[in-house]
Amino acid sequence: MTDRKASVCVLGGGSFGTTLANLMAAEAVPVTLWLRDPEMARHISEQHENPRYLPGIALDERLQVTTDLNAALATAEIVFLAIPSSSFRTVLQQIGPQLAGKQVVSTTKGIEPP
């Protein structure tokens, strides 16, 4: 039996995505958090805090952060979708082929407007 933990990618740097990724990082799960905002990604990487959604909450230093969607997905075995429902279709259209063979968990709430 092995203690190796599956690599995880969390797409979405809001409060829920950041919290999910941080909880996994705290348990030594190799996890990468993807978000669109380069300034926020830099801040989270350097300061270990998401000031927009989780101000004052210290994030685990093992949490990896990127704005490169392809890099985030490249080594992930499990992908959590924690993106707004308004962005869900657009993001899935970009990454659909990259999800083949991966476990995908959607944490997105709401429905996409017509």
Give the positions of each predicted feature.
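NAD(P)+-binding Rossmann beta1-loop-alpha1 motif at the extreme N-terminus of oxidoreductases
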Residues: 1-55, 65-67, 94
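Rossmann-like NAD(P)(H) cofactor-binding subdomain of soluble oxidoreductases
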Residues: 59, 66-74, 78-114
